[in-house]
Amino acid sequence: MDDDTAVLVIDNGSGMCKAGFAGDDAPQAVFPSIVGRPRHQGMMEGMHQKESYVGKEAQSKRGMLTLKYPMEHGIITNWDDMEKIWHHTFYNELRVAPEEHPILLTEAPLNPKANREKMTQIMFETFNTPAMYVAIQAVLSLYTSGRTTGIVMDSGDGFTHTVPIYEGNALPHATLRLDLAGRELTDYLMKILTERGYRFTTTAEQEIVRDIKEKLCYVALDSEQEMAMAASSSSVEKSYELPDGQVITIGNERFRCPEALFQPCFLGMESCGIHKTTFNSIVKSDVDIRKDLYTNTVLSGGTTMYPGIAHRMQKEITALAPSIMKIKIIAPPKRKYSVWVGGSILASLSTFQQMWISKQEYDESGPSIVHRKCF
């Protein structure tokens, strides 16, 4: 395919949108999935105030805006804002006319049917795309790791899923979801930093805490041992400079924050941690494929980027699994973008070309065509 008919691959995350062209090895555009609106009329006088700002522009003007994420827990909840994000993706980030390109979108596992239909409808009716497809995020991550069978623990900003996949097909009966991911960890870090005497409350300050989390947090192999070490020495302490120049010190919060992934009770949640959820997904799968799942446990998404997370998963799952079972955790270095990369790979395959939903098929069958063609 030449660039004129290049396929667009858009991975809409709850926190970040990743977009680019199929065949590339990384997304061209990565920006926050946020829409900001001025807090007060006329507040931004002389700046040719717009009624809304998207992505990085919204982030840079965050002090004057109220920021909203149109996706919650991986599901689109505000369609008007989502359209603004897609519009921004096409016209400002990729600088393409969507009516000239097939578009591959990604979706959360167990995405409600109505949600998939609405995505399909907007692509064909609002953006007039010639063809589109919706792929499950975890399956794309598995492709990126060069596998078609395995279990993906995909954790982004909005949710965490454990998805067993056999020969390219996600197994919905064994797919589990945890409404605990990056955003909850950011909120938790805000809370425990407040206990240290630092105040973070606004949506703008939430973005600062997210940055602290991404730069300084890590997963301890043994959190109790780490707590004892943090209490007796300053070896885990790090400093961070806030935008106003104030420097703050952060200690055991560095590992207490992501520890909530393994102990959701830290957040007052009754659910199992990511290790137990992964194990439960494997046990819900057919007994004949469990061995393949244990040896092909793939981490994916920004919330799996903490240093130490793979070792800890290895330790925890080994403790849960039958003792004879070999456990292998795969943590690809660029796993933050592995969903997007999987989309880029899939859309480039010659065998995939007959999978597209064409405009003609859409016109004949309506939005429900998505359930027949994308599964």
From Swiss-Prot:
Gene Ontology biological-process annotations: axonogenesis; cell motility
Tissue specificity note: Expressed in some hepatocellular carcinomas.
Cited SUPFAM superfamilies: Actin-like ATPase domain
PROSITE patterns reported for this sequence: ACTINS_2 (PS00432), ACTINS_ACT_LIKE (PS01132)
Residues with PTM N6-methyllysine: K84
Key words, A-Z: ATP-binding, Cytoplasm, Cytoskeleton, Methylation, Nucleotide-binding, Oxidation
CDD domains: ASKHA_NBD_actin
Post-translational modification: Oxidation of Met-44 and Met-47 by MICALs (MICAL1, MICAL2 or MICAL3) to form methionine sulfoxide promotes actin filament depolymerization. MICAL1 and MICAL2 produce the (R)-S-oxide form. The (R)-S-oxide form is reverted by MSRB1 and MSRB2, which promote actin repolymerization. Monomethylation at Lys-84 (K84me1) regulates actin-myosin interaction and actomyosin-dependent processes. Demethylation by ALKBH4 is required for maintaining actomyosin dynamics supporting normal cleavage furrow ingression during cytokinesis and cell migration.
InterPro entries xrefs: Actin, Actin/actin-like_CS, Actin_CS, ATPase_NBD
GO cellular-component term (any): actin cytoskeleton
Domain of life (superkingdom): Eukaryota
Gene3D superfamilies attached to this UniProt entry: 3.30.420.40, Actin, Chain A, domain 4 (3.90.640.10)
Major localisation: cytoplasm
Residue positions, PTM Methionine (R)-sulfoxide: M44, M47
Cellular compartment(s): Cytoplasm, Cytoskeleton
Molecular function in Gene Ontology: ATP binding; protein kinase binding; structural constituent of postsynaptic actin cytoskeleton
Pfam name, any one: Actin
Family statement drawn from the similarity comment of this UniProt entry: Belongs to the actin family.
Complexes and interactors: Interacts with PFN1 and PFDN1. Does not interact with PFN2.
Name used for this protein in its record: Putative beta-actin-like protein 3
